[in-house]
A protein has these predicted regions:
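Glycine-rich Rossmann-fold phosphate-binding loop(s) that bind the pyrophosphate
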Residues: 148-149
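Phosphate-binding beta-alpha-beta segment of Rossmann-like dinucleotide-binding domains, i.e.
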Residues: 85, 93-142, 154-162, 312-316
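Structural/interface elements that position substrates and couple domains in central-metabolism enzymes
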Residues: 2, 25, 97, 168-170, ...
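Rossmann-like dinucleotide-binding domain for NAD(H)/NADP(H)
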Residues: 225, 231-324
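Residues at the starts of beta-strands that form the adenosine-phosphate
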Residues: 3, 23, 142, 165-166
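An N-terminal-biased, well-structured beta-alpha scaffold segment characteristic
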Residues: 1-90, 215, 221
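N-terminal Rossmann-fold cofactor-binding loop
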Residues: 8, 28, 170-173, 232
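Rossmann-like adenosine-cofactor binding region
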Residues: 52-58, 172-269
Length: 324
């Protein structure tokens, strides 16, 4: 019986799909050392956000045919190495998109209304805070989107339709012809989007081009009253530059679901700032979506083992061509 290694536990919907069809092996912890030790005898690996798959691990995995992610981001897998060894890398796209978009918009509302600050004041007995502070509204505000893929477009749709906000966007892979919307203003220069935004929301994958995308120069362009929203990947933002921008009031605040290092150190200076709202990379993790992602990743792994194309894979065609 073929063997599937799970780097972490997944929802029961995925387990039920695997049971009786493959031998399931659970990794004791999602570390490179633990995964690397057990991957040597596995035909497939299902991996979540924690842990990573390196070239060294792939080189030692003689039986491995597929690496299946419980999500769409594949930045914790060395895809080039996997392709060199004819291993299909696949992920699940779709179920999480709306949830991540909702999370980004919720950050906007919470930051503009200062829910967390005012909640703390009320709990302290400072009901007079209602006179001391004036939250902002969303209607008519400018939303800047960096990245206009599936999630970015949903964010734009919610902001425009629900809150009557104005949306500008930068995405080098989107043209006015492929945009298909008269409601979104597409800019050729990212700086134009950053400068105009009251809320700057990041929706890009982590690549060599997007790593460190937001640094000191970019924060200098933002309005002093603007907020940064990041539900994409932590390494897209240079955290030291963000801390400096927040402390020196170059921007008004930030809503962060992702961090440069995950899990972040509890002493991370971002957590000392009252104008930061942080969540634990949980934007997509609703009960329904977690089940769909687990099932989708299990289906992808089984399909590849049976010679069928997975729902999403950046290297399926390349591997199939190599195998003839």
């Amino acid at each position: 019986m073929r063997k599937i290694l799970l780097s972490e536990a997944i929802d029961d919907s995925g387990i039920r799909l695997l049971e009786g069809r493959v031998e399931i092996v659970f990794c004791p912890e999602p570390t490179e050392k633990a995964i690397g030790r057990l991957i040597k005898d596995a035909d497939a690996l299902i991996i979540r956000t924690a842990g990573s798959v390196t070239r060294e691990m792939v080189e030692g995995a003689g039986r491995l045919k597929v690496i299946s992610r419980t999500g769409g981001g594949l930045n914790n897998v060395d895809i080039e190495a996997a392709t060199d060894y004819n291993i299909v890398v696949c992920g699940v796209k779709g179920p999480q998109d709306r949830m991540v978009a909702e999370h980004a918009v919720a950050f906007m509302g919470a930051l503009a209304k200062q829910f967390f600050y005012l909640d703390a004041q009320v709990r302290k007995g400072n009901f007079a805070s209602r006179k001391e502070y004036r939250p902002a509204g969303l209607s008519g505000k400018q939303v800047g989107l960096i990245g206009l893929g599936r999630i970015g477009r949903i964010v734009a749709d919610i902001c425009i339709r629900a809150f009557d906000m104005q949306v500008t966007a930068y995405d080098p892979y989107v043209t006015p012809e492929t945009l298909g919307s008269d409601d979104i203003v597409l800019k050729e220069d990212m700086a134009d989007v950053i400068q105009a935004a009251d809320f700057l929301s990041l929706h890009v994958p982590l690549t060599e081009n997007t790593k460190g995308l937001m640094g000191t120069a970019q924060f200098e362009l933002m309005k002093p009253g603007a907020f940064l929203i990041n539900t994409s990947r932590g390494e897209v933002v240079q955290e030291a530059a963000l801390v400096d921008a927040l402390k020196n009031k170059k921007i008004a605040g930030a809503g962060l679901d992702v961090f440069e290092d995950e899990p972040p150190d509890a002493r991370n200076p971002l957590f000392e700032l009252t104008n930061v709202i942080a969540t634990p990379h949980s934007a997509a993790l609703t009960k329904e979506v977690v089940a769909q992602l687990a099932k989708g990743s299990a289906e992808n792994a089984l399909n590849v083992l049976e010679g069928k194309k997975p729902s999403y894979s950046p290297n399926w065609d390349i591997v199939q061509a190599k195998l003839g």
